[in-house]
UniProtKB/Swiss-Prot annotation:
Name used for this protein in its record: 1-deoxy-D-xylulose-5-phosphate synthase
Keywords: Isoprene biosynthesis, Magnesium, Metal-binding, Thiamine biosynthesis, Thiamine pyrophosphate, Transferase
Cofactor remark from the record: Binds 1 Mg(2+) ion per subunit. Binds 1 thiamine pyrophosphate per subunit.
EC class: transferase
Cofactor: Mg(2+); thiamine diphosphate
SMART domains: Transket_pyr
Pfam families membership: DXP_synthase_N, Transket_pyr, Transketolase_C
Superkingdom as given in the UniProt entry: Bacteria
Functional description taken from the UniProt entry: Catalyzes the acyloin condensation reaction between C atoms 2 and 3 of pyruvate and glyceraldehyde 3-phosphate to yield 1-deoxy-D-xylulose-5-phosphate (DXP).
Cellular compartments per GO CC: cytosol
Pathway of action: Metabolic intermediate biosynthesis; 1-deoxy-D-xylulose 5-phosphate biosynthesis; 1-deoxy-D-xylulose 5-phosphate from D-glyceraldehyde 3-phosphate and pyruvate: step 1/1
Length: 622
């Protein structure tokens, strides 16, 4: 993206944090305006996360202005909001390539920049990593500061509270900034609170507080009285002292869009000892009216016209797999009041908006709490209900112990609707659904299904819902194939379906790559099988294919190691069946960002790539 210095004269002077810190404070408001405008121009041309970044323009500038980054360590939780950070840290001219193949990472990435201290993408990891860095900084003894920025959603997760509890115990020097962009904790924002927060962060109050602790440490009753007095004073104008109980010195809330207040506050807090928490209230989408009015719709956007203020409307007649799932939920709930649908803060992405409105008493958004979501489902199942957990493949990783300990061991009837399985596209390595088959396949009692199209997805959801034990249906991001939807009926568990009868080569396909594999089968005169079930496998069919064909090829959008192909390998070995076998899937590496079909082609999972791998394998065996 060509940077227009005439349009952004102040931003041109702030190419790095070092150059930013040379600017006078009086230039910061104009810099905020230019940075916000530049972000709008860049994302509207390239697509990407948008509303979150608009909401932290002032905070990002203030942090890099006050702290000596990258020597001082700045950590962004999740990273949706880090576009302004990337622009200010030497990546301004590359921002139009963010989330694209060979472009900037969609989130902070250690391999991309020294300013990205922690590679992120999942939520609620910042405080734990920050505390580890704080302990390391103490032992280093160079005066390095640690700052973590976490949102009001991410801070509700158990991991964040575990980290804060430990930080309070260790009493290490670190600053946690709570970016409250939903007004979910407090609405007490204004001049009085800004002034009071400045007083609480100032040197006079801090010295008085610390000296008082030392003076009355030998007199517990007086110390307790003073603590209650301090908490009462704070309680008159700030939220509850939950963070104080965890061992943090709480300051705020303050206006996160007043650059001078932020700079002054951070300058005050830079030298405070022990764990500090600064509560900053921001508005997601700040400065762009459409995004302010609907921050959810403008959270992640395609290319759009910033002047029109509208997002391009999709006119696709083929539904997404997420929508297929959401419609199935509604259809099933209409006949079964025992259905309980659970999501860990992914209502829109999982296609559950309609269900949440039509069946609010059967809908549970448990927030960013994947572990709780799974065990909550276990409790519902024990109580006689039929829980359905809608969860992204990458986020199910966070609840692996609960999947085993609380669901599978007890053989409870919990259905997992696993969205974003396989390659997800622009969100890159932290969000690829590459491992679920591998980590679920080894769990006893699990039934695991992978549909080849949207109709089969519905039938598998229905089958899993009726199954008396744990079941999982994994399906990809994006549209189906356009097939007609049939009335619901249960599939025979563990049975596959031959789609094309060929000779010599048998393609055993697990999931939606079946449509691609069909082209290969026709070209090679190969047998094509829709395997449907990863667990239990259709052992009878696999052995028959091994007897009637000279080469078996497994195809899956999961890592090869431990995946569906590995299951076929194990099956053949256990039955002492010798046949040439080629496993096609994702390699043993983390897959970067890029469009889904673009990345499938890059990793040999399009028709051309699959055929090329088969031909190369056959030639090597000749």
């Amino acid at each position: 993206m060509n940077f227009n210095k005439e349009k952004y004269p102040t931003l041109a002077l702030a190419e790095t944090p070092e150059s930013l810190r040379l600017l006078p404070k009086e230039s910061l408001p104009e810099l905020c305006s230019e940075l916000r405008s530049y972000l709008l121009d860049a994302v509207s041309q390239s697509s990407g996360h948008f509303a979150s970044g608009l909401g932290v323009i002032e905070l990002t500038l203030a942090l890099h202005y006050v702290y000596k980054t990258p020597f001082d360590h700045l950590i962004w939780d999740v990273g949706h909001q880090a576009y302004p950070h990337k622009i200010l840290t030497g990546r301004r001219d590359q921002i139009d390539r963010i989330r694209q193949k060979n472009g900037l990472h969609p989130f902070p990435s250690r391999e991309e920049s020294d300013y990205d201290v922690l590679s992120v993408g999942h939520s609620s990891t910042s405080i734990s990593a920050g505390l580890g860095l704080a302990v390391a900084a103490e032992r280093e003894g160079l005066g390095r500061k640690i700052i973590c920025v976490i949102g009001d959603g991410a801070i509700t997760a158990g991991m964040a509270f575990e980290a804060m509890n430990h930080a309070g115990e260790l009493h290490s020097d670190m600053l946690v900034i709570l970016n409250d962009n939903d007004m979910s904790i407090s609405e007490n924002v204004g001049g009085l609170n800004n002034r009071f927060a400045q007083l609480l962060s100032g040197s006079f109050y801090t010295r008085l507080r610390e000296k008082g602790k030392k003076a009355f440490s030998a007199a517990p009753p007086i110390k307790a009285l003073l603590k209650r007095t301090e908490e009462h004073l704070k309680g008159m104008v700030v939220p509850s002292t939950l963070f104080e109980e965890l061992g943090f010195n709480y300051i705020g809330p303050i206006d996160g869009h007043h650059i001078y207040t932020l700079v002054h506050m951070l300058e005050n807090m830079r030298h405070l000892k022990g764990p500090q928490l600064l509560h900053v209230v921001t508005k997601k989408g700040k400065g762009y009216t459409p995004a302010e009015k609907d921050p959810i719709a403008w959270h992640a956007v395609p290319r759009f016209d910033p002047l029109s203020g509208t997002l391009p409307k999709t006119v696709d007649s083929i539904p997404t797999y997420s929508n297929i799932f959401g419609d199935w939920l509604c259809d099933t709930a209409a006949t079964d009041p025992r259905l309980m649908a659970i999501t860990p803060a992914m209502r829109e992405g999982s296609g559950m908006v309609r269900f949440s409105r039509e069946y609010p008493k059967q809908y549970f958004d448990v927030a960013i709490a994947e572990q709780h979501a799974v065990t909550f489902a276990a409790g519902l199942a024990i109580g006689g209900y039929k829980p359905v957990v809608a969860i992204y493949s990458t986020f199910l990783q966070r609840a692996y112990d609960q999947l085993i300990h609380d669901v599978a061991i007890q053989n409870l009837p919990v259905l997992f609707a696993i969205d974003r399985a396989g390659l997800v596209g622009a969100d890159g390595q932290t969000h690829q659904g590459a491992f679920d088959l591998s980590f679920m396949r080894c769990i006893p009692n699990m039934v695991i299904m992978a549909p080849s199209d949207e109709n089969e997805c519905r039938q598998m959801l229905h089958t899993g819902y009726l199954h008396p034990g744990p079941a999982a249906v994994r399906y990809p991001r994006g549209q189906g194939t356009g097939v007609a939807l049939q009335p619901l009926f249960p599939l025979t568990i563990g049975k596959s379906e031959i789609k094309i009868q060929g000779e010599k080569i048998a393609l055993l396909c697990f999931g939606t790559l079946l449509s691609v594999a069909r082209e290969v089968a026709i070209h090679l005169n190969a047998t094509l099988v829709d395997m449907r079930f990863i667990k239990p496998l259709d052992t009878e069919l696999i052995l028959a294919m091994a007897s009637n064909h000279s080469l078996l090829v497994t195809i899956e959008e999961n890592v090869i190691k431990g995946g569906a192909g590995s299951a076929v390998n194990e099956c053949l070995m256990s039955h002492k069946k010798t046949v040439m076998l080629l496993n096609i899937g994702l390699p043993d590496q983390f897959i970067p960002q890029g469009e889904q079909n673009e990345m499938r082609a890059a990793y040999g999972l399009d028709s051309r790539g699959i055929q090329k791998q088969i031909q190369a394998y056959c030639e090597s065996e000749m």
